[in-house]
A protein has these predicted regions:
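Glycine/alanine-rich phosphate-binding loops at beta-alpha junctions
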Residues: 2
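C-terminal cap of thioredoxin/glutaredoxin-like
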Residues: 5, 9-12, 16-19, 24-38, ...
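Structural alpha/beta surface segment adjacent to cysteine/selenocysteine redox centers
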Residues: 24-129
Length: 210
């Protein structure tokens, strides 16, 4: 069963993607100014999927063609956009941080709690990594974030170990791939899509056709 609705602004993202954090900030600026803002639906995309073993662990030896020049260019682009969008952000984090467990807990919170609790967890998870430089792959960090929005630690540990959540997360990732999503962030609305940390006026064009 598809989790995609053309009546919503669907966001394909991963917590470990810096451009997803920046794109989120730009999207929120658009939503604040829009006369009739659309509902937003966050959709998982596993940025590390091509490196992931069946057991969920990451193979850091997989060759991805990304060299020092590539990462230098990414850093330059992130520095430029964080200034342009006025986003507080650190780039002092490990490239080996993996968000898989955080995304499982995020899915659990969305299913078990109200939208406000999910949005708070979602926001604080992004900020934990990109503002505070915390390792959101660490179950203790995930539990701390969850407890700060009222989700008990025991539920977090259970969600991380939940095979059903694992299967649903994989299904949603495969669904994104089948739709042709190959990079993130991708923003989709009413059959149209835009990729990258686009500025607020491009959200207006995507959603309102102006």
């Amino acid at each position: 069963m598809s989790t995609i609705s053309e009546d919503e602004l669907t966001v394909f993202s991963d917590y470990v993607c810096p451009f997803c954090y920046l794109g989120k900030a730009a999207m929120e600026e658009y939503l604040e100014e829009a006369e009739d803002p659309p509902e937003v639906e966050w959709h998982v995309f596993d940025l590390r999927g091509y490196k992931r073993h069946p057991d969920g662990s990451i193979d850091h030896d997989v060759e991805d063609g990304k060299d020092d020049d590539y990462f230098a260019q990414v850093r330059d682009n992130v520095e430029r956009l964080k200034d342009e969008y006025d986003v507080e952000m650190t780039l002092d984090y490990s490239l080996e941080v993996d968000s898989w467990d955080a995304q499982k807990v995020s899915l659990y919170v969305k299913q078990a709690y109200d939208e406000e609790t999910f949005e708070e967890f979602h926001e604080r998870t992004f900020k934990a990594l990109w503002r505070d430089g915390r390792d959101i792959g660490d179950p203790d960090v995930i539990a701390d974030i969850a407890e700060s929005v009222g989700v008990p630690e025991e539920e977090v540990r259970d969600a991380i170990d939940d095979d059903g959540l694992e299967a649903e997360l994989k299904r949603r990732f495969e669904e994104a791939q089948e739709m042709g999503v190959s990079g993130i962030p991708t923003f989709a609305y009413d059959g149209h899509a835009a990729r990258g940390a686009i500025p607020p006026h491009q959200f207006e064009r995507l959603v309102e056709g102006t």
